[in-house]
């Protein structure tokens, strides 16, 4: 089966529908994926860029970003590396009110049973249950 990587810009057009004619391109690809004609692929960097753009440029609130991006990540129309890590990161991003990339790092760490982090960013990481910040002094 043909695999097709989907870039951030197509997801953004689809999620915001600010350019409906471009949003339709991803709708068409999803339909083709659902029919088994191709397999759509995306990675964690694409979703980090989606979250950042929705938050910074489109000014979407975290709960809306969590809701709409989680729906895409959970969709079987896409082959997404680290799907479980992304879903946890989206939940923590919203529920713990932390930066998405920090939530992703914490989720990635927890998946690998790492519970200590050396960081200067105590603000976000202290909010994550089960993680401890290493004393750097």
Segments the model singles out, each with a brief description of its role:
Residues 35-37, 75, 96:
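Structured helix-beta-strand junction loops
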């Amino acid at each position: 089966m043909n695999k097709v990587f989907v870039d951030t810009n197509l997801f953004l057009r689809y999620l915001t529908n600010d350019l409906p004619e471009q949003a339709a391109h991803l709708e068409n690809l999803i339909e083709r994926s659902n029919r088994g004609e191709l397999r759509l692929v995306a990675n964690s960097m694409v979703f980090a860029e989606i979250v950042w753009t929705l938050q910074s440029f489109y000014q979407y609130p975290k709960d809306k970003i969590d809701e709409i991006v989680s729906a895409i990540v959970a969709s079987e129309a896409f082959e997404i590396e680290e799907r479980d890590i992304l879903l946890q990161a989206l939940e923590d991003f919203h529920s713990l009110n932390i930066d998405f990339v920090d939530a992703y790092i914490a989720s990635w760490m927890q998946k690998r049973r790492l519970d200590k982090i050396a960081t200067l960013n105590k603000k976000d990481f202290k909010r994550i249950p089960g993680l401890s910040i290493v004393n750097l002094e």
